[in-house]
A protein has these predicted regions:
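Histidine-acidic metal/acid-base catalytic patches
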Residues: 1-201
């Protein structure tokens, strides 16, 4: 049986009971779908189970996370933070976080590094949204001020902060650069060989 859209997924999950939830795959929505609203609704209903992070354009629904629409990714995280905090959910463990990408023209490990960075950027930007001011703007129906608050956070360059966090954790300041300098791909090929079998599973 095919699940046609998020509404059908929510219906099935509701019928199956409290342990059944919906998975939101960012690439599997109609063009211009309000995914952040879908996320908010599923959270309100207690039926959001997790994510497949990716991006989509034309017929490709498994592009690098944040490569096409990073603003929407930020808005999704804004809804997640607000909704999860209201329900006292643990950001790290209470939802399933997965990257679902198909690496046809990129090194898959480099693509994963870029995807993780995009997720961290959107999450950090959403964390610095002035939630109290945004709530006040909403209560006053002040759409202009709400937009200003969201876009001020979105336009804040949090990459130096993330680099500092990596450095303090003993990780690379520039993961892609270090990956290339250390010839990680070459070493993995040497270790695993060049003969691979793709099963499609």
């Amino acid at each position: 049986m095919t699940v046609g859209d998020w509404g059908q997924s929510l219906l099935y999950a509701s019928k199956l009971g409290p342990k059944a939830c919906s998975l939101v795959d960012l690439g599997h929505h109609l063009p211009n779908a309000n995914i952040e609203q879908i996320v908010s609704l599923l959270l309100m209903e207690g039926k959001l189970g997790g994510f497949h992070f990716n991006d989509s354009k034309y017929g490709d629904d498994d592009l690098t996370v944040g490569s096409i629409n990073p603003y929407q990714l930020f808005l999704i995280f804004n809804e997640l933070i607000e909704g999860m905090d209201a329900r006292k959910m643990n950001h790290a463990n209470d939802l399933g976080w997965m990257i679902d990408a198909s690496h046809n023209v990129k090194d898959p490990l480099e693509d994963l590094l870029q995807s993780v960075e995009a997720i961290k950027i959107a999450y950090a930007q959403a964390l610095i949204v002035d939630a109290a001011a945004l709530d006040e703007a909403r209560q006053n129906n002040d759409v202009v001020q709400a937009q200003e608050i969201l876009q001020n956070a979105y336009r804040t360059d949090v990459r130096p902060l993330l680099a500092e966090a990596r450095m303090r954790a003993g990780a690379a300041l520039d993961p892609v650069k270090v990956f290339r300098e250390l010839n990680v791909r070459k070493e993995l090929v040497k270790e695993r060989g060049t003969k691979t079998v793709a099963t499609g599973l």
